[in-house]
Amino acid sequence: MNKRDLPWVALIAVSFMFGLAVSWERWGNPLVDCGREMNQPLRLARDQMLYSDVRHIYGPLSPYFNALLYKIFGPSLAVLYADGIVSALLILALVYWLSRRLMGPVPSAAATLSVMWLCAFKQAGNYILPYSYSALHGCALGLASLALLVRFVERRDASRSTSNQDVITAGVSPSSRLGNVSLVLAGAAAGLAMLAKTEMGLAAVSAGVVAVALAGYPNVRRTISLGAKFVVPAAVLVLGVYGYILSRVGWQTLAEDSLLFFRHLPPELVYFNKRVSGFDQPLQSITQMIGAAVRVGSVAAIIATVSLLLTRRKRDVVPARLSLADLSVSDAGRASYGQIWLLLAASLLVFVLIPLAGVLNWEKGPYLAMPLLLVGLMGLEFNRYRKQSNEGALNSQTIIVLVVTVYALASLARVILRVRSGGAYSSYLLPASVILFTYAWVHPFAAMFREDKTRRAARNIAVGLILADVVLTAGLLSYRYRDKNTYMLKTDRGTMLAVPDLGEAMNEAIGFIKRETGDAEPVAVMPEGTSLNFFTGRPNPLREEITTPGYLDREGEERAIRQLLESNTRLVLVTNRATSEFGPKVFGRDYCQTLMQWIEQNFDESAILGPDHDPNQQIGDKTFFIRAYRKREPGADGSEPVAAILPRSSMQK
């Protein structure tokens, strides 16, 4: 990077500050997932044990890291916001740095700004208060590992150049030593990414294996040596940390009950993951992917024809008959104006008609086609690598593109048939794909044109369209933040702006909890919403922070009942959280029936909290509410003692 980067880095910084300003304190949803991210580290800071005392389905890195921050700075939303802002800045810096390895300052800035507004500031899945800090930290550490792998490849290339010039008289060159250090650090970063979120660490490991194989080829011994330098740090970190946790909580809790290694997944979570990945309707997903690829192709044709029309002189017309060789894209400048206009019209027609195929429910985002584009780019670059290797003129940039492509494709594994630009999870999977999407327009696509002026025009139009999309997305998100998140929820641990009905219900619930319970008295919130525990300082008596479908089987429900009994929990809150994305929709009706039946037998409904206090509201209604249950005294009004109406298996235990 050089002085040419300064104005574009400044633009990125200004855009980030603007994004923070328009979205300030509007990042989180106090109901879905964020409660876990707030309250779980607080429980760890109070010396509870992850996986055994506090159930967790991701790696241990992020909860313990945020627990450490709580111990240092105190539990507050400001601590979580700061974590998110710093992580977002790190991700954006890595995206720009990686982009500059492949492109000039302008397209690199376009890619970084795309990640900023498509991922970092997206309402569902933003980086500041994410649905999961494990995903955020996994994304940052995965990109850090990727950047270190790229640095390793560059330094290996510099080492070869120095050796060829006979500058090094003895020993290992400085570039080679620095390359080895980068490789070791890349392995350590990959290990940390795996400790944050397993699949993100696996993407980094996949990229590392490919980088080592390509850099070491054809020397097998050197390849094995380089592989050890990458794999050993990752393995030591992962095995060491999980070995310690295993000694504390046992194999059953770590491997099966936590779902950490994707073992014994409940059918509800299998259903959810199929929907996320596109395997719930694979044929339709593949059709949509192909349709998105056709639409991207139509955009390419539009850019190509416009570039040709802008850069051709009108007198440059070819004969009426063309040879087969003259029909290649690089020779498209020889086509007549009529042919070019016809291609433009056809491309526009395809671009417009594809999304209108409503029967197939076409996705409109270009990233739906990303797996196909990545496979095509990988094939193109691997073919180039083979040619360069055979000629003895290997270019490090070819290896870098291949390594980044492998990382991007591996990152998309969980959503491989349904890569949406929307949704909460895609924000943490897309950064490398966004880099390569921009790169594909700037280099492989532009290189298809024979004339420099046409190539420049195509590149400028493509980058201009990406920047225009950034501006449009930024404007739309800014409006949504300001239009929807308008209720100021002020708590003892920070402020957040929420949608009005949700914020009003949460505010009423906070006041209700403080009136009805003591400072250290436990309060249970189901199926989601333990942000209320965090805001009020009341402990959660359950092992689970979330009790959506799949988290509590029959035995888990009975354990939850025992925990409510043993902690003498007097207040239970049930939030209006419909869970149709998991299959079963209503808590207590479609899932957790045993637990809800026990609550209704032992607790009285005492309040409806929210803008509408109608007691007949049901979970799934449009207006948000929270139903509060107060514990019925044992034996009062002729009711049975609590222990007498436990499920039989619990009484036996």
Predicted regions and their residues:
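Perimembrane helix-loop-helix junctions
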Residues: N2-K3, A158, T169, A203-L239, ...
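Membrane-lumen/periplasm interface segments of specific transmembrane helices
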Residues: G19, G227-F272, V276, T287-V296, ...
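Extracytoplasmic catalytic/substrate-binding loops of multi-pass membrane glycan-assembly enzymes
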Residues: E25-Q40, L50-L68, P75-A78, V249-W251, ...
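Short periplasmic/luminal acceptor-recognition loop of GT-C membrane glycosyltransferases, typified by
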Residues: I57, V205, Y481-Y551, E558-S580, ...
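Transmembrane-helix signature of polytopic, membrane-embedded enzymes
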Residues: V95-Q123, C139-A140, V329
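Membrane-interface transmembrane helices that cradle and orient dolichyl/undecaprenyl
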Residues: G142-L185, P218, A292-T311, L324, ...
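Membrane-interface alpha helices of multi-pass inner-membrane proteins
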Residues: N180-T198, A204-A211, V236, V241, ...
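Hydrophobic/aromatic-rich transmembrane helices and adjacent perimembrane loops
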Residues: L202, E363-G379, L402, S411, ...
